[in-house]
């Protein structure tokens, strides 16, 4: 069935593109807020704070944080097992990169265009402040990926497709991702390839996902 992960820089239009791709393909759309709702069913309430802030070195040894990351990885795999889903995630490529039926996408844009988008979408007047905010967000993003996953969010081999919305419209980007997914999923059933169908999902987690997503993970009883 396939899963698409989308990693995007703030101000690139990645959220809109991910939602549009999901709508075009008839897939579910999942972002960090969805994952946070699932984690809260386990009493883990600090995911979004950790996700957005960029972890310190001390954060790496806190038991609660390590549990959050472990559970988040399980959630991403369980969502992938569900299939027909677009996951907006900084680390989807790191968690699901080994599956033949996962298309990992990176959305980027030059800083100047990102500033323009943020200024326009948030009604800001101070472009310098907007750029500073974007750079801080980039730093937090990179720290989260590097410190918890030992990966780099802009590594060339991490993605099957990279789209630059500095030169590509949101409409064209949506079309490119959807077409790439259709092509990738047609050729993913290669003999010996590891697919998301091999993922085993804990029944309790499957139930939590069903509560949030509205339908069960295939192959599980909730």
Identify the residue ranges that each predicted region occupies:
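Short, polar loop motifs at secondary-structure junctions
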Residues: 89-93
């Amino acid at each position: 069935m396939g899963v698409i992960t989308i990693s995007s820089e703030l101000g690139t239009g990645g959220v809109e593109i991910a939602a549009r791709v999901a709508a075009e393909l008839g897939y579910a759309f999942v972002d960090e807020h969805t994952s946070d709702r699932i984690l809260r069913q386990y009493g883990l309430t600090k995911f979004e704070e950790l996700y957005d802030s960029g972890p310190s070195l001390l954060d790496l040894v806190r038991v609660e944080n390590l549990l959050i990351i472990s559970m988040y990885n399980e959630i991403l795999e369980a969502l992938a097992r569900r299939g027909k889903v677009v996951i907006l995630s900084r680390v989807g490529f790191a968690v699901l990169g080994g599956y033949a039926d996962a298309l990992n996408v990176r959305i980027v844009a030059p800083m100047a265009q990102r500033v323009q988008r943020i200024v326009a979408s948030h009604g800001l007047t101070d472009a310098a402040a907007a750029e500073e905010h974007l750079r801080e967000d980039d730093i937090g993003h990179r720290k989260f990926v590097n410190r918890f996953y030992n990966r780099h969010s802009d590594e060339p081999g991490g993605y099957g497709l990279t789209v630059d919305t500095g030169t590509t419209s949101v409409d064209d980007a949506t079309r490119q991702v959807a077409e790439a997914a259709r092509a990738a999923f047609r050729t993913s059933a290669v003999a010996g390839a590891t697919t998301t169908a091999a993922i085993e999902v804990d029944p309790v987690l499957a139930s939590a996902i069903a509560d949030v997503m509205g339908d069960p993970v295939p192959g599980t009883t909730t």
